[in-house]
A protein has these predicted regions:
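Binuclear metal-dependent phosphoesterase catalytic core
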Residues: 2, 11, 73-77, 147-152, ...
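Active-site neighborhood of phospho(di)ester-bond hydrolases with catalytic His/Asp-centered motifs
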Residues: 2-3, 24-30, 48-53, 69, ...
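A generic local structural motif
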Residues: 10-16, 34-37, 67-69, 106-111, ...
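N-terminal active-site segment of His-dependent metallophosphoesterases
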Residues: 1-42, 110, 114-118, 212-213
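Active-site environment of divalent metal-dependent phosphoester hydrolases
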Residues: 6-11, 31-37, 53-59, 89-93, ...
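Short, structured coil segments at secondary-structure junctions
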Residues: 42-43, 63-64, 173-175
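Conserved catalytic scaffold of divalent metal-dependent phosphoesterases
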Residues: 2-10, 51-140, 206
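A short, gly/pro- and small-residue-rich
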Residues: 43-54, 142-145
C-alpha cells in the first residue's frame, strides 16, 4: 500500500527487485498521478487507487494504466476491495465530503455490497472516526467507516491522510487497520483469506441511518 508521499525508494532510486514479489499495489491517495503511472509501467502488479483530498489533478490527468476503485468493489483473485476516497470536507472543492455525504456514497453501494456479499478489504483515504484520525477537520475520520467494519467485518482496512503521527497498525475488533503512509508491505496468507470468507458479513444491507429503508 502507498499514500500521502512518493517513496524515493520506489521512484527516485527505483530498484525493480523491490516489487518482484508484490501482487497488487493499492494507493490510498494524495500521490502524484505520474508516480502511479510509473509504478504501473515497471511492475506486473495491477495498481488500484482511491483519490485523496489533494488529488483534484486526477480529473484532468488520471494515472495511466491504473484502476480507480472509487465507489466500487474490485475483486482480485477472490479478494474483494471496497474503495472510498476523499477526506472530511473543510472547504469547497473535489474529493471532500461531509459525514452525511459519505454515508450517501455508501448507501448507493448497497446493491454492490449485497451482490458481492460484503468485502474483505476497505480502502479509503481518510481514517475512521477516532481510529488514527486527527482533531482538525481535514484529518477527522468518518463514522460510516466504523459502521461498515461493524457490519461486514473485513479482514483489512487501509487508509491514509494522517502521515506518520500514529503507529502503522492497530486493530478494530476483528479488522487489521493499516496506515499506508509512504509505503508499507502487507502479506496476507491464503489460509487467512479463506478463513475470512467463512465469516463473511450479512447478505442483506445494513439498516437504520446508514441504509435507510
Amino acid at each position: 500500500v502507498i499514500a500521502d508521499i512518493e517513496s524515493k525508494a520506489l521512484w527516485d532510486y527505483f530498484d525493480k527487485s523491490m516489487l518482484e514479489n508484490v501482487d497488487l499495489i493499492v494507493s490510498c491517495g494524495d500521490l502524484n498521478p505520474k508516480y502511479l503511472s510509473f509504478l504501473a509501467t515497471f511492475t506486473k502488479a495491477p495498481v488500484i487507487y482511491v483519490r485523496g483530498n489533494h488529488d483534484a489533478k486526477y480529473e484532468m490527468t488520471p494515472p495511466d494504466g491504473c484502476i480507480c476503485i472509487e465507489d466500487d468493489i474490485f475483486e482480485f483473485h477472490g479478494v474483494r476491495l471496497l474503495g472510498l476516497g476523499g477526506s472530511m470536507r473543510y472547504k469547497e472543492g473535489s474529493n471532500m465530503f461531509t459525514e452525511k455525504e459519505m454515508k450517501k456514497r455508501v448507501n448507493k453501494m448497497r446493491f454492490k455490497l449485497r451482490k458481492k456479499d460484503g468485502f474483505d478489504i476497505l480502502v479509503t483515504h481518510a481514517p475512521a472516526y477516532q481510529l488514527n484520525d486527527g482533531d482538525d477537520i481535514p484529518h477527522k475520520g468518518f463514522q460510516v467507516f466504523r459502521d461498515l467494519m461493524d457490519c461486514y467485518k473485513p479482514l483489512l482496512f487501509v487508509h491514509a491522510n494522517y502521515g506518520g503521527r500514529y503507529k502503522r497498525e492497530c486493530k478494530y475488533n476483528e479488522t487489521r487497520v493499516v496506515n499506508a503512509y509512504e509505503r508499507y508491505y502487507i502479506d496476507i496468507d491464503d489460509e487467512v483469506i479463506e478463513e475470512n470468507r467463512k465469516k463473511r458479513g450479512p447478505k442483506t444491507p445494513l439498516i437504520g441511518n446508514l441504509f435507510p429503508k
